[in-house]
Curated annotation (Swiss-Prot):
Induction: Induced by nitric oxide. Negatively regulated by Fnr and Fur, but no obvious Fnr or Fur binding sites were found, suggesting that this regulation could be indirect. This is Iron-sulfur cluster repair protein YtfE. Homodimer. HAMAP family: RIC_YtfE. The lineage of its organism: Bacteria, Pseudomonadati, Pseudomonadota, Gammaproteobacteria, Enterobacterales. Keywords: Cytoplasm, Iron, Metal-binding, Stress response.
Amino acid sequence: MAYRDQPLGELALSIPRASALFRKYDMDYCCGGKQTLARAAARKELDVEVIEAELAKLAEQPIEKDWRSAPLAEIIDHIIVRYHDRHREQLPELILQATKVERVHADKPSVPKGLTKYLTMLHEELSSHMMKEEQILFPMIKQGMGSQAMGPISVMESEHDEAGELLEVIKHTTNNVTPPPEACTTWKAMYNGINELIDDLMDHISLENNVLFPRALAGE
């Protein structure tokens, strides 16, 4: 099957582990989820046929849950428990680890200078963002008023873009989240946690941008 003309966001939701494949190739399926596979591959100078072949293998597996057809209230509850609550646990711990690594290894050229600052910025932005969703937008959608939520949704999508930009800064600061040979246990654990955060946040944004928001605006 030809996947090249399909949007990344749609592929990430319909094919098991496609999101992990896109992460491997550094393709943005959340904020950039509307771009086709062909366009995303061309921008990264990748062979689209190779990626299509990998997607075809993944598509042979059954998908755990197709959120594209789930009730909006169920999607919202899932987002809060699976992503919002998780981010609230992840970021404070990562900030503590980054503070320690930057202090203890300050004299090493490979130290991720500024990482604590960028993680703190992401924590502050996401905390405000998630609170607005939980207190304003999500209740509107659950009450069937999603079609009137163009303003709040536009703001949320803009904030998603800002979070995505911060993730790029964090990846750049950490050599694409790759620990150097001399990294201590805390350093390695922190990078594992950052990779997990990036995966979670990209899946979180993809579910909102590519499923919840369009369906809410359509009046479901």
